[in-house]
Amino acid sequence: MKSWVVTLCLAIITVALTAESYLIQAVIVDPKEHPVSEVVISDGSKTVFSNEKGYFLINTSADTLTFHRLGFQEKKLSVKNIGKKVILTPEPVVLPRITVSDVAWNIVSPPPDKISLPIDPDRHYYSAGEVLTTNPAIHSNDVPLPGESQNISILGNLSRHSLIILDGVPLNPDGSSFDLSLLDPNNIESVDIIKNNVSVYGGSSAIGGIVMISTKKGLQQTGKQFSISTELGSFGYAQNSLSFTFNQPSTIFRINLSNLSTDNDFRYKVPEWWSPDSTAIRSNNAKHQNSLAASYTHLNKKSHFSFQTEYLSFMRQLPGTVNFTEIYKNASLSGWANRNRFNLNAPLFSGELGTLIWLNLDQTTYDNTKAPLPVYLSHYKQSLLNAGIHGSYGQNSSLTPELSLNTSLSAEAGYNSYQNNNLLNSANNIDFSSRFANSILKTELKMDKGEFIWSNSGAIRYDLTEQENEFTWRLESSLQSLGYIETTIGGTLGTSFALPSPYDLYWKGDSQALGNPDLKSEHSQGWQLWMSNQWNKLYLKSAFHKNDIENLIQWRQIQMWGNVWKPLNIGKARIKNVEIEAGWQPWEWLNLSTSALFTNAKDISEHNEEAAPYLVYIPGRNYSLKMELNWKKLKLWSDYHYSGKQYTTPDNLTEPFPGYSLLDLGLNYSMFIQGWNVSPFFTIRNALNKQYDIYAYVPQPGIAFYGGVSLQVSNP
C-alpha cells in the first residue's frame, strides 16, 4: 500500500511544478494610512494574515485574492493589480463572529498544533463521529451506521484517552469514552483537534488528544433563515431535521430539531467455519433518536453573552454478539441527555475576561430481562451529573514592534455525581460523587519579523480531585517561514493523566465483571515533531509522535471463584506514530488529498519494545485518498479508506483480523426555485460491498444507499 501513496505524492509534485505562481508582498492600510493587522488574505485554498504592521506575504497561483477583516469592507483584487499597498475601507460592525473561548489559552494563543477539520456544509453526515473520522489520525472501531454508538481513537490511543470538549465544556473528564452519536451533526459549526498529551488544556482523559467541537450560534450576517431536510436510506433509515435562525445587530437566536429512526437490520456473511456459504440478518437492532438544540446570543459593543442548550432522547436495541443472540435478544438501552452552557466574554483593562458556567445531565436505562435464554439478566438505571464554573483572563502585550508576550490564566471548579441503581438487586447499587478544581497558566513569546514568525510557549496546570492531585505541563514551539515556499516546523513536549472511571472503580452489576477500587490514575509523557510545506496549491506535511503511558488500565479476565473480568493497571505502554499528508488543488473545481498513519502501539510492561505484544484493536496502518469535484451547482466526492490488521487478544497469540478497505461516494446538487435553495443529495457507503471484521462476532454492514433533499430560504 506504500507504493500508491508515494506515487500519488510524486505525481502531485510533478504537475505542480508547471503551475504559474505569484509571490506577493504588500502592506494593508486604512484610508488614513494606518496599518491594519490580522486581515485574512485568501486565494481560495490558502490563507495568511497581515502582521501588526499590516504586512503580508503569500505565494499563490490563483487569479484573485480576497481581503477580509471585521470592521472593514471585504475586498477582492486581481493578483496582477496588487501593488505594494492595499487600502481597506472601514464599515460599521453589524455582527461580529461569535466565538466561545474553550479556556484562557484560546483567547490569546492557541496551540501551534491545533488543526481545524474541514466540514463540508453541503455534505450530510450521519453522525458526529463521521465528521471526525475524515482526519486520518482519528479512527473508530464502531459500526458505521446511524444511531449506533460512536467512539473515536486519536493516534492509536484508547477511546477514553480522547477528551471531547463541547463549547468549552469537557464531556468525558471522568475517564470514560464519550459516545459521539449523542451529538447532532446538524448542530456542529466547527471542529478543532490537538494531539498528544494535552491535559494541561483539558484535564483528565486527554492523553491521546482533545477534540473541540463548537456548535452553531447563528448566521454571519443579519436576517432570518429557515431550513428543512429529509433523508431516507438502507436498513429502514429515515431522518428529518428543521432549523430556524434569527439574526439582528445585537441578538441572535437559533433552534434546531432532528428526528432519526432506523432498523439497522442488515445482512452479513456468516463465518466459514460456522456455516459455509451462508448469510444471516443482524436483527433486533433498531435505533430511535430525537434532539432539540437552541442558542441565544446577545451582543453589547465588544462583549457578549450566550446560552446554549441541547436535549436528546434515544432508544437502542442491543442485540449483542451474534454467537449469543438468544441471551441478549430484546435487550435495549434508552435514555436522555441535557447539556446547558452560559458564556460571558468581555474586555477588561487591556485583556479579555471569560466566564463559562455549565450543567450536564445524563440518564440511561439498560434492560435485558426479556431474553429467551435468561443467562445474563440485567436491569439498571444510570444517572450522571456534571456542573462547573470556569473563569479565564488573557492579555496580549507588545514588548517591541516585532515581539509580543501573551499571558493567560484560568481557574475552574465543579461537581460530578454518578449513580447506578440495580433494579434487580439494590445491594449492587453504586453512588459516587466528587468535587474538582484546577488552574492553568500559559505564556507565549512571539516574534513576527514579517518573513517569518517564531513562537515559543509553555503551560502548566494543577488539578485537585478527591482521588489524586495532578500536575501537568506542556512546552510548544513553532517557526513559520513565509517565503516562496511557506514552511512551518514545530514540536511539543508534555504530560497528561486519565482518572479511572466510576465504572472501572465500583462496577458490581453482574457476575461476569467486577470493579477495582484500587486502580491508579494513568499517566503519560510524550512529544511530537512536524513539518509542513505549502507551495502553489500543493500541501505536504509529515509528523512524528511518541507517547509513553504508565499504569494503563485494561479489563482482563482473572480467576476469582470462576472467570471474572476486572480492570487492572497493566504497567506501561508505548505508542509511536508517523503521519504523512498531501493535498493538491490544481483548479478551483478539483481538490485531491491523501494521507497515511503508521502506528506502533505496544504493551512494554513485561518485555522490551521489540518483543512486546501489540495493544489490541489498534490498526498498524491507516490510508485515505479523497477527491472532490466542485462546480457551480454540482458537487461530487469520493472517500477511500484502508485500515490495517488488528490484534484481538493481549498476548497476540490469536490470529489478527485482516485489514479492510472502504469506499464512500456522494453527490450534491443545488438550485434555486421560487426563492428556495433546493439541494438534493445522494450517498453510497461501502460502495464496494466489502465484508470485514473489527470485533469477533460483531458483523459490519455491507453496501448502503442514502438520499434526501434539503430546502433553505433566507430573508434579510
Predicted segment positions?
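N-terminal periplasmic "start-of-domain" segments of outer-membrane beta-barrel proteins
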Residues: 42, 46-47, 53-55, 98-124, ...
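Short acidic/polar hinge/loop motifs at secondary-structure boundaries
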Residues: 56, 169-197
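Periplasmic-side early beta-strands and strand-to-turn transitions of outer-membrane beta-barrels
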Residues: 71, 247-333
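A beta-strand signature from Gram-negative outer-membrane beta-barrel systems
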Residues: 86, 185-227
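Extracytoplasmic beta-strand/coil segments of soluble accessory domains associated
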Residues: 129-170
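Short strand-turn segments of transmembrane beta-barrel domains in outer membranes
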Residues: 216-246, 257, 279-285
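Outer-membrane beta-barrel signature, preferentially recognizing the C-terminal barrel domain
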Residues: 226-231, 330-346, 382, 481-486, ...
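Gram-negative outer-membrane beta-barrel transporters
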Residues: 395, 448-453, 546-548, 569-648, ...
